[in-house]
Amino acid sequence: YGMTKTKGYIADTQRNYQGNYYYIFPEISASGDLGDGLENNMVLLVNSAGFTVKEDLGDTLTVDEVMTTSPDGYAVTENEQTQGEYTLAAVAEEGEAKLTVIASESMINSQITDYFSNLDNKRLFVNMVLNNFDDVENLSIDPKSLSVEMNTVQHAGSISTALIFGVPAVVLIGGFVIWM
């Protein structure tokens, strides 16, 4: 179906959770039925495999990449790190046949979906499954979570640096100006 699995784990140095390159926030390009109900277009994948899509697919085969890494993605093995943009989920269609591929089982891992309840992992997974059936609709109602929601900040390192060094510098400079 025009997809080749890459060797090793996929890491992303640009779109990751708190500096851990194997905790990836992929770029999501879900349109139509795949994008229904997505609130913030954020999905977290942990220790994901990946694959590449062939450029010459022929006339009847189409592959829609649903989740990809940034161009700063890496396929990491014991011996090498290969930089590139890798596909983490895709839908291939040829005639009446559809194949949906998700490269990471962590997409619906309860440890991730319970801890980060503001992510769209479950919704996108259900949309991808329902996309394979033309006459089925999602009638599920999301339960109200009573747990504390954790805030997921993508670029915490730069914000922390600005607050740790920037705010005291402004206070010190302001104090010296008033003192003089």
What role is predicted for each listed range?
Residues M107, D114, D134-L163:
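Short, aromatic-rich amphipathic segments at membrane interfaces
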